[in-house]
């Protein structure tokens, strides 16, 4: 190959990115992330799922093999899925469920760069452990906002290195009861339950039982005001009150809650997460992921201030903070200066005070730190002598700076269009019970809706035209989504909702108290200009409603990625109990779905199909009609097309037959006992 062609090929690869393949094997087995054993989901034998790291622009191919007893899918949270909507991972929208014993191929471009994560999107199985971090490194030479933190060239270089080699901290909650049992507890008790056993840091934690009276003494003023005649349980769980249960509180049956879920604390000791930093690096990036299913968490690192420089995978103008509230689905990347005395410092992550008094503890460990800088373990096993910002109850112990979540302007500046083309007003809230929800205000979105007839494949179906659950948009248009909570006099105060849209980031251009009584966003802007920000509005993929009574939020985005996408609350039980809608973006430019997805091959291309099906795919490539045409003249053309057509019809049927047989073989393998399966897997590997 001439040298210039080789150079050109290398440049093309740099632009397009490498082809990267990964395999995720899902199993249902015993685990004890907080010291208490239960059945759970493991990925490649571990929990949390493996951290996936790609370079910006990589061509990613991930084979997911389901060896569990239930079907599943995986969503790649925050990835735009431009031109690959069949890989978004939502059953009933972008794919059919991956049944037990089956496999599925996800293909997408690693873009945009930044901190993301992946998790199950089938029923409420996020509670069972299927989630992991996904990080996309920026291209070399990409500018960052480092000079807004420090103008020192050495600091800038150190921060750039740290941003591409972060310490990832997955924050999640965990309970002994699995997702099915938890949902049954909600339904049987007719109550919205928020209680868990543990907060986990990178899948590690313990069950803390500091004592009922100790917890009662730690109650802060708003708690006494919220339940003057009641108290928290020995697990720190809040009592059921009208602000969370609505007018159906009296219908609740606390006795139907399983033992140990709401009260009855039993301590268990599990592992403690520690991240090691080298002060010679000057700076470190700690990337926090809100992988919780219920909890709103408040992370801090003793004696270390944070510079938040990226939110939901997008650079912002850095903001200094000692702590912030991180909700389900959110991500915050924080730069910390490594200039403290070399020793251990506690990482403390309490619940932010919304549903339970509970916390997790980890360690920021300086390399070559002082081994004597320790104390006797306290009631939580903490041995550090560092000074905390907040107590176990999330109450400040000294002056601390909270992050203002409405003051997170994207960097460089990025603003939406001045006017929207369409407006959709959604009335979020309960659906005639404490534990069922609606996003549209009209209907619940069933968790298995159109599961086996994905709307991506059936954009003109009857289910794709249900105005109560479906929004249809035109490509290139600007859409305004108005989220209204507290609109019903039956429940004027509603618990916050973390609303996430697939395939898009969007701007929060406005928000205000009261009821939305406007025919357009422009009318509202004219009436309440102080409630809108069109200069530097926050830009991310997850936004919140507020716990302040009736209020509204206006979100704006442009339709640039046609496909079937989900809009939903990221609290797992809210989603599984109905708080979602489908947005069919760009119905006028609907994507063509490749045959390997529409024809039941689960993303496997002809030559990739297992067993004999793969053989027939290879043979078909050799004997397809166009190959015969190349070998003959004009007289052969008609004959080759005729023979080739018959051959393609026959081999397609055979290929499908062998694929079905291969999947049945996978199910047979799945049904073997656990030890035999592991032995078989060892042989295959």
Swiss-Prot record:
<feature type="glycosylation site" description="N-linked (GlcNAc...) asparagine">
    <location>
        <position position="178"/>
    </location>
</feature>
<feature type="glycosylation site" description="N-linked (GlcNAc...) asparagine">
    <location>
        <position position="71"/>
    </location>
</feature>
<dbReference type="InterPro" id="IPR001117">
    <property type="entry name" value="Cu-oxidase_2nd"/>
</dbReference>
<keyword id="KW-0677">Repeat</keyword>
<feature type="binding site">
    <location>
        <position position="121"/>
    </location>
    <ligand>
        <name>Cu cation 3</name>
    </ligand>
</feature>
<comment type="similarity">
    <text>Belongs to the multicopper oxidase family.</text>
</comment>
<feature type="glycosylation site" description="N-linked (GlcNAc...) asparagine">
    <location>
        <position position="253"/>
    </location>
</feature>
<feature type="glycosylation site" description="N-linked (GlcNAc...) asparagine">
    <location>
        <position position="432"/>
    </location>
</feature>
<feature type="glycosylation site" description="N-linked (GlcNAc...) asparagine">
    <location>
        <position position="229"/>
    </location>
</feature>
<dbReference type="GO" id="GO:0016218">
    <property type="term" value="F:polyketide synthase activity"/>
</dbReference>
<keyword id="KW-0325">Glycoprotein</keyword>
<feature type="binding site">
    <location>
        <position position="119"/>
    </location>
    <ligand>
        <name>Cu cation 2</name>
    </ligand>
</feature>
<keyword id="KW-0479">Metal-binding</keyword>
<comment type="function">
    <text>Multicopper oxidase; part of the gene cluster that mediates the biosynthesis of viriditoxin, one of the 'classical' secondary metabolites produced by fungi and that has antibacterial activity. The first step is performed by the polyketide synthase VdtA which condenses one acetyl-CoA and 6 malonyl-CoA units to form the heptaketide monomer backbone of viriditoxin. The product of VdtA is then O-methylated on C7 by the O-methyltransferase VdtC. The O-methyl group is important for the stereoselective coupling of the monomers at the final step of viriditoxin biosynthesis.</text>
</comment>
<dbReference type="GO" id="GO:0016020">
    <property type="term" value="C:membrane"/>
</dbReference>
<dbReference type="InterPro" id="IPR008972">
    <property type="entry name" value="Cupredoxin"/>
</dbReference>
<dbReference type="GO" id="GO:0016491">
    <property type="term" value="F:oxidoreductase activity"/>
</dbReference>
<keyword id="KW-0472">Membrane</keyword>
<feature type="binding site">
    <location>
        <position position="75"/>
    </location>
    <ligand>
        <name>Cu cation 1</name>
    </ligand>
</feature>
<feature type="domain" description="Plastocyanin-like 1">
    <location>
        <begin position="26"/>
        <end position="139"/>
    </location>
</feature>
<keyword id="KW-0732">Signal</keyword>
<feature type="signal peptide">
    <location>
        <begin position="1"/>
        <end position="17"/>
    </location>
</feature>
<protein>
    <recommendedName>
        <fullName>Multicopper oxidase VdtB</fullName>
        <ecNumber>1.-.-.-</ecNumber>
    </recommendedName>
</protein>
<feature type="domain" description="Plastocyanin-like 3">
    <location>
        <begin position="466"/>
        <end position="585"/>
    </location>
</feature>
<dbReference type="InterPro" id="IPR033138">
    <property type="entry name" value="Cu_oxidase_CS"/>
</dbReference>
<feature type="transmembrane region" description="Helical">
    <location>
        <begin position="627"/>
        <end position="647"/>
    </location>
</feature>
<dbReference type="GO" id="GO:0140783">
    <property type="term" value="P:(M)-viriditoxin biosynthetic process"/>
</dbReference>
<feature type="domain" description="Plastocyanin-like 2">
    <location>
        <begin position="168"/>
        <end position="368"/>
    </location>
</feature>
<dbReference type="InterPro" id="IPR011706">
    <property type="entry name" value="Cu-oxidase_C"/>
</dbReference>
<dbReference type="InterPro" id="IPR011707">
    <property type="entry name" value="Cu-oxidase-like_N"/>
</dbReference>
<dbReference type="InterPro" id="IPR045087">
    <property type="entry name" value="Cu-oxidase_fam"/>
</dbReference>
<feature type="glycosylation site" description="N-linked (GlcNAc...) asparagine">
    <location>
        <position position="475"/>
    </location>
</feature>
<keyword id="KW-1133">Transmembrane helix</keyword>
<dbReference type="InterPro" id="IPR002355">
    <property type="entry name" value="Cu_oxidase_Cu_BS"/>
</dbReference>
<dbReference type="Pfam" id="PF07731">
    <property type="entry name" value="Cu-oxidase_2"/>
</dbReference>
<dbReference type="Pfam" id="PF00394">
    <property type="entry name" value="Cu-oxidase"/>
</dbReference>
<keyword id="KW-0812">Transmembrane</keyword>
<keyword id="KW-0186">Copper</keyword>
<comment type="pathway">
    <text>Secondary metabolite biosynthesis.</text>
</comment>
<feature type="binding site">
    <location>
        <position position="500"/>
    </location>
    <ligand>
        <name>Cu cation 4</name>
    </ligand>
</feature>
<keyword id="KW-0560">Oxidoreductase</keyword>
<dbReference type="GO" id="GO:0005507">
    <property type="term" value="F:copper ion binding"/>
</dbReference>
């Amino acid at each position: 190959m001439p040298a210039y062609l080789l150079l050109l090929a290398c440049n093309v690869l740099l632009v397009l990115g490498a082809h990267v393949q990964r395999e995720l094997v899902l199993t249902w087995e015993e685990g004890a992330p907080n010291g208490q054993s239960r059945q759970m989901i493991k990925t490649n034998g571990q929990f949390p799922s493996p951290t996936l790291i790609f370079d910006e622009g990589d061509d990613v191919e991930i084979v997911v093999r389901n060896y569990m007893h239930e079907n599943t899918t995986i969503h790649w949270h925050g990835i735009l899925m431009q031109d690959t909507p069949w890989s978004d991972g939502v059953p009933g929208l972008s794919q059919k469920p991956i049944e037990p014993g089956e496999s599925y191929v996800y293909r997408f471009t690693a873009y945009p760069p930044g901190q993301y994560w992946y998790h199950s999107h089938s029923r409420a199985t996020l509670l069972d452990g299927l989630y992991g971090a996904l990080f996309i490194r920026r291209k070399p030479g990409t500018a960052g906002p480092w000079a807004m933190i420090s103008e020192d060239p050495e600091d800038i270089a150190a921060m750039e290195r740290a941003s591409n080699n972060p310490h990832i901290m997955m924050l999640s909650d965990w309970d002994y009861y699995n997702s099915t049992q938890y949902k049954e507890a909600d339904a049987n008790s007719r109550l919205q339950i928020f209680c868990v056993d543990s907060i986990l840091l990178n899948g590690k934690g313990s069950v803390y039982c500091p004592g009922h009276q100790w917890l009662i003494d730690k109650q802060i003023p708003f708690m006494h005001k919220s339940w003057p005649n009641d108290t928290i349980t020995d697990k720190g769980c809040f009592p059921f009150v009208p602000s969370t249960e609505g007018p159906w509180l009296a219908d609740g049956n606390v006795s139907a809650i399983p033992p140990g879920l709401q009260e009855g604390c039993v301590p268990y000791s599990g592992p403690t997460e520690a991240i090691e930093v080298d002060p010679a690096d000057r700076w470190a990036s700690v990337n926090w992921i809100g992988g919780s299913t219920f909890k709103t968490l408040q992370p801090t690192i003793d004696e270390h201030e944070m510079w938040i420089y990226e939110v939901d995978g997008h650079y912002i103008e850095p903001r200094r903070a000692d702590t912030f509230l991180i909700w389900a689905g959110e991500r915050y990347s924080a730069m910390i200066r490594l200039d403290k005395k070399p020793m251990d410092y506690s990482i403390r992550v309490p619940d932010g005070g919304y549903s339970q008094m509970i916390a997790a503890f980890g360690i920021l460990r300086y390399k070559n730190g002082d081994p004597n800088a320790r104390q006797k373990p306290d009631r939580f096993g903490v041995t550090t002598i560092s000074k905390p910002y907040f107590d176990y109850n999330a109450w400040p112990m000294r002056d601390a700076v909270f992050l203002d979540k409405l003051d997170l302007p994207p960097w460089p500046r990025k603003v939406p269009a001045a006017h929207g083309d369409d407006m959709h007003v959604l009335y979020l809230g309960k659906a005639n019970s404490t534990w069922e929800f609606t996003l549209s205000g009209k209907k619940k979105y069933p968790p298995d809706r159109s599961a086996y007839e994905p709307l991506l494949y059936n954009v003109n179906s009857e289910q794709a035209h249900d105005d109560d659950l479906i929004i249809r948009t035109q490509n290139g248009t600007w859409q305004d989504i108005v989220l209204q909570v507290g609109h019903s006099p039956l429940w004027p105060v509603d618990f916050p909702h973390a609303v996430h849209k697939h395939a898009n980031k969007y701007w929060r251009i406005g928000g205000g108290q009261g009821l939305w009584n406007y025919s357009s966003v422009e009318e509202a802007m004219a009436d309440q200009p102080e409630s809108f920000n069109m200069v530097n509005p926050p830009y991310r993929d997850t936004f919140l409603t507020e716990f302040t009574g009736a209020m509204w939020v206006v979100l704006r985005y442009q339709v640039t990625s046609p496909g079937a996408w989900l809009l939903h609350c990221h609290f797992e039980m809210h989603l599984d109990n109905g708080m979602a809608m489908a947005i069919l973006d760009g119905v006028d430019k609907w994507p063509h779905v490749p045959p390997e997805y529409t024809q039941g091959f689960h993303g496997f291309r002809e030559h990739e199909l297992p067993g004999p099906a793969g053989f027939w795919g290879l043979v078909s490539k050799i004997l397809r009609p166009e190959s015969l045409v190349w070998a003959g003249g004009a007289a052969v053309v008609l004959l080759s097309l005729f023979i080739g057509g018959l051959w393609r019809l026959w081999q397609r049927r055979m290929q499908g037959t062998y694929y079905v047989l291969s999947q049945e073989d996978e199910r047979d393998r799945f049904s073997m006992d656990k030890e035999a399966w592991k032995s078989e897997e060892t042989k295959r590997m």
